[in-house]
Regions:
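Ribokinase/PfkB-type carbohydrate-kinase core domain
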Residues: 1-150, 154-157, 212-215, 221, ...
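Conserved post-catalytic alpha-helical subdomain immediately downstream of the catalytic base
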Residues: 134, 150-220, 227
């Protein structure tokens, strides 16, 4: 922690994003993650966190909830799926994720429970993946801001090329949307469409442009990345 001038690091920042992978790596990484989030909040920077639970990484003596429950107390925007809420925050998710059909109302209840437990949170976005087959998923998301509950368009993603990076691309799209678009609904739709397109791209990164995402949002459901 002492190796950095934390105040100066956030002097010109407006948004700080972290994922649950970083504090899972080691005790020092967990300490740095918490300190960074606290400092960002103190400096008036918006903090977002993709909970992103990875069981195999938590092997240094602390469980994910022991670390993440404190970290999330310094977060404004949480991003998760139902497993992240359960495994990182200890909040039971009452839904059957392997059924191929998810109930939106269950996600409304889950989002409400998270915000009640963490009143510091301004919003939570939760992704919803209905696995029909290995290469055919229905993909959508919800967002709750403590007052209004939003649901995105549901995409039928067929012939999936690579699911890796789907969550990261959703987070990136949401951050873009919350900073650039007029409403939470628009931000959620942009995030879901960005992640939908990522399923057609091999590798970790969503190499798509804003224009390509907008094409999909405007009704171009071809699923093709424009090149």
């Amino acid at each position: 922690v002492e190796d950095f001038n934390w105040d100066s690091l956030f002097d010109s920042a407006a948004w700080f994003h972290i994922t649950g992978i970083t504090p899972a790596l080691s005790p020092s990484a967990a300490e740095l993650s918490l300190h960074a989030a606290k400092t960002a909040k103190k400096k008036g920077v918006t903090v977002s966190c993709d909970l992103n639970f990875r069981k195999k990484l938590w092997n240094y003596g602390k469980t994910a909830p022991q670390v993440m429950e404190e970290l999330v107390q310094h977060v404004d925007v949480a991003i998760a799926n139902e497993e992240d809420c359960q495994k990182s925050l200890g909040i039971e998710a009452d839904m059957e994720v392997t059924s191929g059909s998810l109930e939106v109302e269950k996600y409304r209840e889950l989002a409400s429970t998270v915000l009640k437990k963490y009143p510091n949170l301004e919003k939570i976005a939760i992704t919803m993946r209905e696995a029909i087959t290995a290469d055919h998923n229905n993909w959508s998301a919800v967002l709750y801001n403590g007052k209004d509950f939003f649901t995105s368009r549901k995409y039928q993603v067929t012939h999936i090329v690579d699911r890796v990076g789907g969550g990261d691309s959703f987070a990136a799209g949401l951050i873009y949307g919350l900073n650039r678009l007029a409403s939470d609904q628009e931000a959620l739709e942009f995030a879901t469409a960005t992640s939908c397109l990522k399923h057609s791209i091999p590798g970790d990164l969503a190499l798509v442009s804003v224009q390509e995402v907008e094409h999909l949002l405007q009704g171009d459901g071809s699923g093709r990345v424009q090149r």
